[in-house]
Amino acid sequence: MNKTNWKVSVTTFNCGKEFPVENSKAIVKQLLFPYDDGISQLELQDLYVLGFQEVVPIWQGSFPAVNRDLIDRITTTAVNCLNEKVSATQGDEQYSCLGVNSLGAITIIVLYNNNALKVKDDILKRNGKCGWFGTHLKGGTLISFQMTRNGEENWERFSYICAHLNANEGVNNRNQRIDDYKRIMSEVCDSEVAKSDHFFFLGDLNFRVTSTYDPTTNYSSTTTLRRLLENHEELNLLRKGEDEPLCKGFQELKITFPPTYKFKLFEKETYNTKRIPSWCDRILYKSYAVPTFAQEGTYHSVPRSNALLFSDHQPVNLTVRLPRSTGTPVPLSLHIEKYPLSWSSGLIGQIGDAVIGYCGWLVTKNVHYWILGSLLLYLLLKIL
């Protein structure tokens, strides 16, 4: 086990409101081991983080108890997949679930090597809503914990936010995404979380390419990718802003893969041109004062195998070695702007969540037809 670095794998995946439970093992294996060719020796990580958006229909996100079985099944499947890999190579199970947190249809799952690592019990879990009227339609879910290696006492804090920001193209929607990011960071981060030794912000951030779509674009060309990413990609342009750069204190490894959205369902490489192909799915991490860090990670889209074709998004994985903390306090390096919220926003959001949930349930069960039919029958009887 490397004593100087943490080995971490982070994957984000928008499931498109539909997670086929019957195929959960194939899906989870692809997300955990995106670079496993079945031949080379696979290096297992200290931590595995799986971030999901739209893992269930949006209305179903209003009922956490209903979603618990699905989340538990995904978590158990992930643990079993990891321990099967361990058994095949080392013959000894060593992975378990460190924690799970959810907000609506957004979920984050953290798995760790419990034979080599220890975690303090005070795991923080927080949520920040930024959907319409403060609902869970959009938002972020945080899990934050302190961890060290067995035999060591230098605890380091890891924090992960899995987010789903405002969708669609255009300046107004871009500005709403900026507000969503600020609101989530403001709601879930206090000074302790902001000082985390290791901090990741991941998910379907929904930032778009602003250039007009050209059907002849060659996304396999590195020159084309560089031109789009440097000149027309919203998040990159916002992060380079001179006056108020977005995501200050975070950085991102160089993107070398084609856009991850929007694909035609059940097709591996064909984009749905109702939307401009964009890099919506991203993984940012806290900036380090270690110049070689960028050379110690891989940042790729996960191949769209048959198991993943049910979504119009392509998952993204970041596998990195993180530098160990020196143990000395560090100043706040993440810019967190206090987002103004009214005293009633929480209550309005709760009411909105309930309305979304029950209205969605009524439509799904076709109850609205029964209500409409009963109303028409009542009016007919009154007339007669």
Swiss-Prot record:
Subcellular location: Endoplasmic reticulum membrane
GO biological process, one term: protein transport
Entry membrane topology: Peripheral membrane protein
Annotated GO CC locations: endoplasmic reticulum; endoplasmic reticulum membrane; fungal-type vacuole membrane
GO molecular function, one term: phosphatidylinositol-4,5-bisphosphate 5-phosphatase activity
Entry keyword set: Endoplasmic reticulum, Hydrolase, Membrane, Protein transport, Transport
EC numbers for this chain: 3.1.3.36
Family annotation (SMART domains): IPPc
Database matches in SUPFAM superfamilies: DNase I-like
The keyword Transferase is annotated on this UniProt entry: no
InterPro entries referenced in this protein's UniProt entry, alphabetically: Endo/exonu/phosph_ase_sf, IP5, IPPc
Catalyzed chemical reaction(s): a 1,2-diacyl-sn-glycero-3-phospho-(1D-myo-inositol-4,5-bisphosphate) + H2O = a 1,2-diacyl-sn-glycero-3-phospho-(1D-myo-inositol 4-phosphate) + phosphate
Keyword Lipid biosynthesis belongs to the record: no
One Pfam family of this chain: Exo_endo_phos2
Function, in words: Regulates the phosphatidylinositol (4,5)-diphosphate levels on the cytoplasmic surface of the endoplasmic reticulum and thereby regulates secretion. Does not utilize phosphatidylinositol 3,5-bisphosphate (PtdIns(3,5)P2), nor phosphatidylinositol 3-phosphate (PtdIns(3)P) and phosphatidylinositol 4-phosphate (PtdIns(4)P).
Family in the record: Belongs to the inositol 1,4,5-trisphosphate 5-phosphatase family.
Other observations noted: Present with 1200 molecules/cell in log phase SD medium.
Protein name: Phosphatidylinositol 4,5-bisphosphate 5-phosphatase INP54
Organism: Saccharomyces cerevisiae (strain ATCC 204508 / S288c) (Baker's yeast)
Source lineage: Eukaryota, Fungi, Dikarya, Ascomycota, Saccharomycotina
Gene name in the database record: INP54
